Amino acid sequence: IAQFERTLISGDSKFDKYLLGEISLTQEEENGFNVFMDEAKGDCFHCHGSNNNPLWTDNAFHNNGLDTTFQDLGFGAVTGDPNDNGKFKSPSIRNLAFTAPYMHDGRFATLEEVINHYSEGLQKSSTIDPLMKKVNEGGVHLSQKDKNDLKAFLLSLTDRKFINNPNFQE
């Protein structure tokens, strides 16, 4: 199985082609990338990586402000350490157009809901990740334009060729 999984390489998204200089991003996608990378705006890259990390995840466990108390202890259930309660592994955002519902428990059906959570829905708890710098303000408070542009960028990470590859069907 591991050998097969090593053949599953997604690297033909619009953003991948942009990095290779083959195409341009729309203004919305480009602004969305800037929102993603800007610590004063989206500040998404700490957990979900950047164009220097083709996996688009740090593969680490974080409490991203979903709850103030935890029915699901997350990583804390594995380690037994209460400091790990509410921490879940950051997923790759590559091909996220195909991975709804979102979050560890599927609580968000749409990308808009996910973006709204980080924008104005953060919940403070004793184990909140220090990377959630705006938790005391409830989130990063993106404008509607920045939210729309961030979504456009995130969707540019969709590799339809990979998803539709007949070698990986059934």
Where do the model's predicted regions map?
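Non-globular targeting/processing and membrane-anchoring segments
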Residues: 2-13
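Short glycine/threonine-rich turn/loop motifs
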Residues: 13-117, 122-129, 165-170
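Extracellular low-complexity, Gly/Ser/Thr-rich intrinsically disordered linkers
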Residues: 107-161
